[in-house]
């Protein structure tokens, strides 16, 4: 990898290790026993399978109790799993349509806003909302339109000026 690529990885990819009984370093670079670290830091970690998609097999530490987390570690040790530090994501209130009540209801959702960057320029967005920590569609998330309020105001001002 080039220096620029390495910088991008270290800047944007959270601390990641293969789940195994080994010595390594923690996110600050201190030596650790990895399994002990994983057990002690459940609320700040997520474990992900190497060969799955759509949120299948992901263990979100802050959503599990200690017993469930220990079971997750055993599962991770028997397969190919990675452990990563938690990345804080936005949660906010959004309206949704409740077809049972035929009414709009407000709820708190996890926001997943993923820019498509080409040659240093943002060329588009993928935006999803989810009632859970996982935003992918198979885990209950849903794609939603992204609207730039700044751009919308500018276009509205242009339209008003044209009238």
Language-model-detected regions and their locations in the chain:
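Active-site nucleotide/adenylate-binding loops and adjacent lid/helix of ATP-dependent enzymes
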Residues: 1-91
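ATP-dependent carboxylate/phosphate-activation module, predominantly the ATP-grasp catalytic core
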Residues: 51, 56-163
């Amino acid at each position: 990898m080039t220096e620029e690529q390495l910088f991008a990885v270290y800047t944007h990819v959270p601390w990641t290790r293969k789940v195994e009984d080994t010595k390594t370093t923690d996110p600050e670079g201190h030596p650790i026993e990895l399994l002990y670290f994983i057990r002690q830091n459940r609320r700040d970690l997520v474990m992900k399978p190497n060969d799955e998609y759509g949120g299948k097999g992901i263990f979100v530490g802050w959503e599990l109790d200690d017993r469930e987390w220990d079971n997750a570690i055993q599962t991770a040790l028997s397969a190919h799993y990675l452990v990563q530090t938690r990345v804080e994501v936005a949660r906010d209130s959004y309206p949704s349509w409740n077809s049972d009540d035929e009414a709009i209801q407000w709820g708190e959702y996890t926001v997943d806003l993923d820019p498509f960057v080409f040659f240093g320029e943002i060329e588009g967005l993928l935006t999803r909302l989810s009632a859970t920590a996982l935003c992918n569609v198979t885990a209950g998330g849903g794609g939603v339109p992204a609207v730039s309020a700044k751009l919308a105001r500018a276009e509205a001002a242009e339209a008003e000026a044209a009238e």
